[in-house]
From Swiss-Prot:
Further remarks about this protein from its record: On the 2D-gel the determined pI of this unknown protein is: 5.0, its MW is: 11.7 kDa.
Name under which the protein is recorded: Unknown protein from spot 2D-0014M9 of 2D-PAGE of liver tissue
Top-level taxonomic group: Eukaryota
Length: 12
């Protein structure tokens, strides 16, 4: 699964 979200939620 790819965790790709268009929101900077503390994810690099």
């Amino acid at each position: 699964x790819d965790n790709v979200q268009d929101s900077p939620s503390x994810q690099d």
